[in-house]
Design a protein with these regions (language model features):
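Gly/Thr-rich phosphate-binding beta-strand-loop-beta motif of the actin/hexokinase/Hsp70
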Residues: 1, 26-31, 131-164
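Short glycine-rich, Thr/Ser-proximal phosphate-binding strand/loop in the N-terminal lobe
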Residues: 1-4, 43-47, 160-179
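Active-site neighborhood for divalent-cation/phosphate handling
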Residues: 4-5, 9, 13, 27-134
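Short amphipathic alpha-helices and their capping/turn segments at secondary-structure boundaries
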Residues: 14-23
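Solvent-exposed loop and beta-edge segments used for protein-protein assembly and interaction
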Residues: 22, 86, 146-148
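Structured loop/turn residues at beta-strand edges in well-structured enzyme cores
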Residues: 23, 114, 163
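Generic beta-structure capping elements
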Residues: 33, 97, 157-159, 171
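Glycine-rich beta-alpha junction loops
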Residues: 123, 149, 169-172
Length: 179
């Protein structure tokens, strides 16, 4: 779930699409499927970045259902670090994906001759077109809903700051015309 089953086959499809589009662009920004990523806000003390990375990794172990050594882990502060005093708690959004999920996507892209420059997570990638609008009202609460074929993501924000994220797997969606 959320993994590229056949990277070589996907690479071939991407190559064909690129030929059809007659593009020479090779740099790509993409996002991992909702089903491949665990997103969780956690709190850690503000400290030098290297130490904070270790603290996030240690704290994230409590929430990840597989060995921490098998994941690619990243985080982003939800409050600018310049606004937090050293030693105070800072809330960060943690993203964790199994290494094989990341490797499958990267293998397919590189196999198609592309150069991945950003690998984001789908719930946040969908917010980019809304960034300016969300930032205009920093105290307003927004719910962004992305309904997809394989999953739905909900992102609750105050202004442009995420408060909570949920990814829901679609069990089965039937679209019926008429009755």
């Amino acid at each position: 779930e959320g993994m590229v089953a056949e990277p070589a086959a996907l690479a071939q499809e991407i190559k064909e699409l690129l030929l059809e589009a007659r593009t020479r662009k090779r740099y790509v920004v993409t996002a991992l499927s909702n089903l491949a990523v665990i997103l969780r806000p956690i709190q850690v003390p503000k400290m030098p970045l290297k130490e904070m990375e270790e603290a996030v990794r240690w704290e994230a172990e409590r929430y990840i259902p597989f060995p921490i050594d098998e994941v690619v882990l990243d985080f982003a502060p939800l409050t600018p670090l310049s606004e937090v005093q050293e030693g105070e708690q800072v809330q960060v959004m943690v993203a964790a994906a199994r290494q094989e999920a990341v490797a499958g996507v990267l293998e397919a892209l590189r196999g198609a001759g592309l150069v991945p420059v950003v690998l984001d997570v789908k719930p946040f990638a969908g917010l980019y077109p809304l960034e300016a609008r969300l930032a205009e009202e920093p105290d307003r609460v927004f719910l962004v809903l992305d309904i997809g074929a394989e999953s739905t993501s909900l992102v609750l924000l105050r202004g442009d700051k995420p408060l909570a994220v949920r990814a829901l797997k679609q069990l089965k969606v039937l679209l019926v015309d008429g009755d």
